[in-house]
Every structure is written in C-alpha cells, then in structure tokens.
C-alpha cells in the first residue's frame, strides 16, 4: 500500500510523491491525516523566505493537523496525557519533539527545546516518508507527544 505526499521542492515549487506506508517502530504511531492547516511557516517556505527553504532540498511540509490512528507501534496504549487510544481514534500532535533534558525543557518550556526540530523538513524519499501533514499519512515518532481529540470537537477546530 502506498500513501501520497506533497513536498517542498524549492522556491514556489511543490512536488508530489507516492511512497510505501511504513512499518511502525515500537512506540510510534502512524496517522491517516483527516484535516491540515497551512501555517505561516509553510507560506514562508513556499516564498523561499525561511531558513528551512534555504537549502532547497526536498522536504515534507505541514504540521498543524488532526488525524485518525492508522497503526500503533508496540507498547502504545495511551496518548501523552495517559488517555487510552486505539486504531481509529482522532489525535493531534505538536510537530516538534521535546528532549526533556535541555535547559528549556527542564524549565517546562518545551516549545523552546534545543533539540525540537530533528524530524522537521524530512526528505519524502527517506524512511518513514511521511514527515509532514500535507500527505495522506503522518508518522509520529516514539519520542513525540500526541493527544486524543474528544468526539465533541470537530476536525476543523481540532486542527
């Protein structure tokens, strides 16, 4: 089975790819993207006016989304708040990963983690392929937080 990806190729240019749906490593989650936003950083990349666009290498884009759990890696039973999860549940996830060890993380400022962006802008031709939400699927790494979305919250608000 293959999934579809829209990726950044360079200034004002996006490409399209189909890649195999990856096997999910222990502790990871694969999500079927239901709804995604276009963020200001995505627009800056498209215009070529961001640091991420400077290298102009192929990179997955999109990071504000709501999705449905498609595959669960071994050991994943709850979200980052301890709520039980199963295949089919809707979730959201911050696009950054927090190390929990740097000065910012120790101060509770996970948004300023020094190691937060190690998986942002991944090449769509490299495993796990689905590193952005402008795609049919999105890969959530074992160290990445995610949260179950209540049934009462519509996709358009959850994203």
Cite the ranges covered by each PLM segment.
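Extreme N-terminal starter segment of soluble prokaryotic enzymes
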Residues: 1-4
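Extracellular beta-rich ligand/substrate-recognition surface
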Residues: 6-13
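NAD(P)H dinucleotide-binding glycine-rich loop of Rossmann-like/cofactor-binding domains
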Residues: 101-159
């Amino acid at each position: 089975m293959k999934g579809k990806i829209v990726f950044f190729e360079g200034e004002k240019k996006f490409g399209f790819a189909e890649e195999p749906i990856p096997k999910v490593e222990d502790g990871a989650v694969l999500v079927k993207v239901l709804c995604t936003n276009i963020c200001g950083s995505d627009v800056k990349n498209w215009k070529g006016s961001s640091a991420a666009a400077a290298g102009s290498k192929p990179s997955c884009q999109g990071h504000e989304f709501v999705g449905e759990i498609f595959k669960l890696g071994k050991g994943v039973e709850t979200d980052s708040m301890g709520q039980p999860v199963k295949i089919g549940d809707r979730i959201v996830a911050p696009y950054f990963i927090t190390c929990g060890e740097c000065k910012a993380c120790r101060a509770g400022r996970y948004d300023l983690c020094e190691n937060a962006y190690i998986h942002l802008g991944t090449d769509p031709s490299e495993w796990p392929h689905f590193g952005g939400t402008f795609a049919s699927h999105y890969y959530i790494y074992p160290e990445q937080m995610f949260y179950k979305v209540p049934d009462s919250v519509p996709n358009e608000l959850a994203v």
